[in-house]
């Protein structure tokens, strides 16, 4: 455990940020899972609606640095291709 006051403060801040980031990541994954569920069910219109919401969340997380921009692009392109396959 840290002995210096500033190090103690940093440890507290780091833990608070870790918990916040974990909840944000969990929320993002939930949006992604919703799109996968709609695709698996074969519901194109519902999948497209969920995809639009998922895009917003994933882009926001990428802009904040929670995930890499390429990971965000990978999620979006992968799901867009799956939605496009639905007839």
From Swiss-Prot:
Residues 1-11 have a biased composition (Basic residues). It comes from the Bacteria. Pfam families: Ribosomal_S20p. InterPro entries: Ribosomal_bS20, Ribosomal_bS20_sf. Gene3D superfamilies: Ribosomal protein S20 (1.20.58.110). Transmembrane segments: none annotated. GO terms for molecular function: small ribosomal subunit rRNA binding; structural constituent of ribosome. GO terms for biological process: translation. GO terms for cellular component: cytosol; small ribosomal subunit. Keywords: Ribonucleoprotein, Ribosomal protein, RNA-binding, rRNA-binding. The keyword Ribosomal protein applies. Residues 1-27 are annotated as: Disordered. The keyword rRNA-binding applies. Binds directly to 16S ribosomal RNA. HAMAP family: Ribosomal_bS20 (MF_00500). Belongs to the bacterial ribosomal protein bS20 family. This is Small ribosomal subunit protein bS20. It comes from Haemophilus influenzae (strain ATCC 51907 / DSM 11121 / KW20 / Rd).
């Amino acid at each position: 455990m840290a002995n210096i006051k500033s190090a103690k403060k940093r440890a507290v801040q780091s833990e608070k940020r870790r918990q916040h980031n974990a909840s944000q990541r969990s929320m993002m994954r939930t949006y992604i899972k919703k799109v996968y569920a709609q695709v698996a069910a074969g519901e194109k219109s519902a999948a497209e609606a969920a995809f639009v919401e998922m895009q917003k969340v994933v882009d926001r997380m990428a802009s904040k640095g929670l995930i890499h921009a390429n990971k965000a692009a990978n999620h979006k392109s992968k799901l867009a291709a799956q939605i496009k396959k639905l007839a």
